[in-house]
Amino acid sequence: MEAKERKETVRFDAIRLSLASPEIIRSWSHGEVKKPETLNYRTLKPEKDGLFDARIFGPIKDYECLCGKYKKRKYEGTICDRCGVEVTRSDVRRERFGHIELASPVVHIWYLKSTPSKIGSLLDLTSRDIERVVYFESYLVIEHPTEEEEEAFEKDPKSLPLMEGGLTKYVKLHVVSEDEFREREYEYSNAEKYEYGMGAEKVKDVLARIDLEILAKRLKKDLHGYAGTFDDLNLSYKMNYPRLYNKAIIEIARKFSEVGLRFGDIEPTEKEIDVIISQGYYIVIDPASSDLKFGQIINPENVDSLPEGVIALTGVEALEKLYKAYREKVKEIPIFEVIKESVRNVILKEGTDARLKKIIRRLRLVEGFIESENKPEWMILEVLPVIPPDLRPLIALDGGRFASSDLNDLYRRVINRNNRLKRLIDLDAPEIIIRNEKRMLQEAVDALIDNGRRGRMVTQNNRPLKSLSDSLRGKEGRFRQNLLGKRVDYSGRSVIVVGPELQMHECGLPKQMALELFKPFIYRRLEEKGYATSIKSAKKLVEEKVPEVYECLEEVVKQHPVLLNRAPTLHRMSVQAFEPKLVEGKAIKLHPLVCPPFNADFDGDQMAVHVPLSVEAQLESYILMLSTQNILSPAHGKPVTMPSQDIILGVHYMTQELPNAKGEGKIFGSPEEAVTAYELGTIDLLAKIKVRINGKIVETTAGRIIFNQILPEGYKFVNEVLDKKKISKLISDIYEKYGNEIAAQTLDKIKEIGFRFATKAAVSISVADLVVPKKKAKILEKAIKEAETVWKQYVDGIITKGERHNKIIDIWSQATNEVAKEMFNEIEKSERVENGKKYPGYFNPVYMMASSGARGSRDQIRQLAGMRGLMAKHSGEFIETPIMSNFREGLSVVEYFISTYGARKGLADTALKTAVAGYLTRRLADVAQDVIITGEDCGTLKGITVSSIIESGEIVVPFKDRIIGRYTAEDVYDPYTGELLISANEEITEEVVDKFEKAGIEKVKIRSVLTCEMPHGVCAKCYGRDLAQRKLVDIGEAVGIIAAQSIGEPGTQLTMRTFHIGGAATAKEVQTQHKATHDGTVKLQNVKFVVDKKGRKLIINREGSIKILDKEGKTIERFPAPYGAVLYVEDGQEVKEGTILAEWEPFSDPIIAEKGGEVELRDVILDVTLKEERDNITGKTIYTITFLRPKDAQLHTPRLVIKGEDGNEYVYDLPVNTILLIPKENLEEVWDKCFACSEAEKTDIHHKYLQVKKGFKVSEGDVVAKIPKEKAKVRDIVGGLPRVEELLEAREPKNKAIITEIDGIVKIYEDAKEITLINPKEGKTETYKVPDTTFVIVKNGSFVKAGQSLVDDGSIVAEFDGMVRLKSEGSRIVVFNKETGQQKDYKVPKGKFIIVKDNSVVKAGDPLTDGTPNPHDILRVMGIEELAAFLVKEAQIVYRLQGVEINDKHFEVIIRQILRKVKIVDPGDSRFLLNEIVDKLDLEEEINKVISEGGRPPKAEPVLVGITKAALTTRSWISAASFQETTRVLADAAVEGKVDPLKGLKENVIIGGIIPAGTGIKEYSEVEVVLKEEEKEEV
């Protein structure tokens, strides 16, 4: 049978949205609606000229006019002469528009009240002003220029070009209130000068007259100034942009004088620079042998008479040459780039973001209108379309009442007001009444289009009416409710029960459901077999449920797959295809192995069934969606269709060995012989026996032999105890070697054997199985003692509250772990006797369940038989008192109360966080939905470099896991032999990875979607292997959606899992030391240390690292050397595995004395920069640095100074929260005058300073102060999801680190605007202002001698001896690079901790202060690859903590999407604007276009946008509108006349097309499926 021809829908490739002109609206309409009436209450027929008029909208019954004169189809197309209704289908009432002719124009509210207002932007008025005009509160006055003013108007950026009689004139718009209007007497003044009006009418008039072309030119010119660079400076630039020009030349003059360059004898000022650039004056670059001086300025008239050989130039080029010649003369590297950059920055700074954004916004809008050929006046409505009546139905309820759509109400108000306004105008009513009516009409139309945007119309019972916009937006709107999520016919749902007898590709379908779902197929089969003659009789048979029906049902269902789906559908494995087997009863039977992918259990879950109808759909279900095709997860490539619980327990039990069991030590000639012996009862299932297998004698058990019999033929003999992980590996391996069919069969066999032996093992749980460890009491006693010691330290004031908390948490975490360890040890050692057999401890049922991975975790058993341990508060902090009992002993009342905390948090979290995770998934899917594999190979040479991930010295993700299945980006050679291991663009397979490991290769450059160069979508080689199929990804695979699901699904899952543990928190054990994990030689790289009194080596810098080298000198391990750590090894020392290299105190950062000497505190003032806290519990005093008022932070800089024995001062900044560790008896409080405060307040102010008593010294290596770290908190994904969101939304972190943009050497200065020098004895004070370019080289509170330089360039010198006071705002870190001469200056606010030292060497991208790195900074400084690596690493940390595996490539896909945009830094000759953010694709197209026309291409830099913004700024307006902010997206798209190229998935779903992925891509669209009858059985 040939496939039936289907009626093809019109294929189209793109959809354009634009504004409708009044003519277009009238052309849609079938008639004008003049009356607000709907139906006649007696006849219930529509009223003539009303909102449901059949003459306008079409007949109510099919092929029947209203009066009933014409009935039947033969009259189709006739218009009834009596009632005027066309005889046609009643469906036309769903598609025919009407219209209302408005008596006065009305503004479309979308264009008035959007932010920013479109009309406002166009007229350069604020949205508030436009509103006042539209709602008749103010006048719009147009000021025309007089002849004298014309030129001034033209230059004024505030004027607007309007067309009048073919000419364009510049006018000014004023919005004037009524009172002002009367005062100014505009009415009576010059009619040619002023024109005025109110309401939408006047606005329309102005909009219609705007000359868009000229406005665009003018805006471009304004923008052009801000794109100016050094090379653009000339006379015309000066004329056009005087302000920018002046700023630039002042900057050049400043830079020239900084380097000491002179024009002859003259100091360079802006005057000299100006004459050279704009007035044609020359400068001498090379005086040759003449008397002229280098740099001398020459009048243009005298140039011709210059002596021979003299080189003189003019313009900006002259300045550049002069500068370079000068720098070469003084033997310095010429870096004119620095000047160019600073000129560029000065000009850019003038174009503040707001100013530039506004111009760009206006220009975009104007160009949008020009390109789309929309007219601005179409934003004002003259004609209002009336949507078809069946889309706003009026339904008769019983009892003679009607339910009506809100739209009818809204339309009625519009018509009423419109008719009243017409009447008033005809009656020539007073202006004020007409004005009021016009305003009311405007409000009525506003409410119809978007109710609630301005004012809110409500029903009688105060419910806001649902307007047209409301029916589009939000979850219940048209897009999300009806277009993206349709309900499907041929589906049903029911409860699921387990079906262990099924095969893996089958499900049990209740006969009742099947009968309903397959009805049409059954009818057909009944007719074919001659049981029924017509559909009608077939229907009857089915209703009567005769036996023949069931016979046909069996045949129809055979080989017809159905789809099963379990909500929530979080990833593609939540919908799978099965072959139905008919079952009695009403429940769907589900195969137990497919529960994990569905996340289903049998405690009342329901599932939905869908029937694929067409042959193509059935084929796709079979080939792609059958459950046997979904064994591996697309998120990480490991099996997800997996045995669990009982099955695992059974397999675990049958592969155990039982010592001294019956028949131990017997020898068998073949596996079959051994199995027979077991079946005859001669040997025990678990007895150790010897068997000849493949010619070798193997020691094994009968159980293992039975297990091996179900494995595929030729698979190696598995001779070990199996648990969940090993079974997963086994399945993975079988899949790899034998393909998915064999894997599926093996899974089925494992299921059967697992259930069988779980039954035989009869493992059950009993209270006696929970062994409470004997050593528990001792461990607890020890922990209690330790905790008491910590309390004592706290009471004695040695440690702070925070440190006490952290230490106690650490003690109890360790104690809990020890108890658990002991418990498991005891369980393993304890023997039990059953039926005369001795079973070792590992046969303890509870232990077996946990160790096999069948159910429960070590944590849960710990709570049952060990101790419950620490509990978390709802805030995530730990409660210091742990629960020492376990569930077997029972909890005390207090313990029970403490544990309710966590349990309740779990339940509350589950409810709240599910929504958060769901929303994250939705944003991810939206941003990545159009990433599809569109080609085999894009041919790029780029890639990213990957290596293993190491966290605190441990390999968390091995190298091979990161590269397997990816493609190389370049050839890889063996570093020792030089042989080629793999060429570029080849797949990295398991064999290749082994080669890499042998050759010791630790990093390799691989292809990645981040660097893929496909214009749309990505190519297969950049993506690599499809994780679920273990082969190169297919063209057409929707990898974007898969990425979104893989990242979103665990988020949703994990937030639902919190409450299972019941709040029992596990603190991450704190790392306090580095241990060598290999033997080798120690290499200390850049580690500086001091030796303290006890002879310990303390590390005193942060950039060092400790390496372990092997015999060849290759680095095998690398540990960061933390500041303040005690170093236990020497450089070059040989160490064994397990040697402690360094150890540190984890709960605070110390400040260590680098040298011994006297101590002095500066600016440490009680109640100003220091708070004295007395602990109520301990009675001890703790001094903590803090700023009590923000103002204090500017005036004071707390510091600790050690006057070293070597005569140098060692200064340490004390950041906020620092705790002083100088013993209280060595401190004293001294009242003294504070010069900084006195200066600021202009009156004498005294403070209480904390000072160190004379004679108190510290030794080298003493800890003088410490900065405590945060309290330990529970890290679960609920804390982690917001972090993932922060990363993917590209938000700036709250406490962001400052990072350096260049390599270089660090210098740290005070960031002070003024220096005050004070000599109290002589009563002298002197204040110096510090320019931005100079750096203060003296510290606050230091003493200086007369004549000493206070700043780096020597421009400020102390006039007398005295003390320095700085009005400081923090520090300035300057990074200087000697090679390039580049210098960057960073301001660090007070209280932020600087982690670099003076003169330390930094690399671009290194952090200078503490805090979280800001991704935008990383992108700017280090580029896309580093940023991507950072985002992937940070996001993976969150998931890894939860034990969730997600392949890196999924994050890469999302990151590719949020890096799609670039910011234009130089528009060149392109259509782009300065600072505009555009799509990379658009940029590339434009660059090619500009180059082909011989222009200057634009330059751009990458920007990072968050996932929400990326989804909203996608090229498809349909997709963006269905995501968020629907009305705004649609309004913008309409004005610009945007075209949607329909390249993504969502937009095609919305228009009802086939999605361009999988079999829907263009390549497959021509394929036709032909079925031949006899082949059908084998489909």
Curated annotation (Swiss-Prot):
Q: Which residues bind Mg(2+)?
A: 601, 603, 605
Family matches, as SMART domains? RPOLA_N
Q: Which UniProt keywords apply?
A: DNA-directed RNA polymerase, Magnesium, Metal-binding, Nucleotidyltransferase, Transcription, Transferase, Zinc
Q: Which domain of life is it from?
A: Bacteria
Where Zn(2+) 2 binds, per the record, is at: 938, 1012, 1019, 1022
Q: Which residues form a coiled coil?
A: none
Which GO CC annotations does the UniProt entry carry? DNA-directed RNA polymerase complex
Its UniProt entry gives the catalysed reaction(s) as: RNA(n) + a ribonucleoside 5'-triphosphate = RNA(n+1) + diphosphate
Cofactor(s) this protein cannot do without: Mg(2+); Zn(2+)
List the HAMAP family hit by this protein, alphabetically.
Answer: RNApol_bact_RpoC
This chain's protein is named DNA-directed RNA polymerase subunit beta'
What organism does the record attribute this protein to?
A: Sulfurihydrogenibium sp. (strain YO3AOP1)
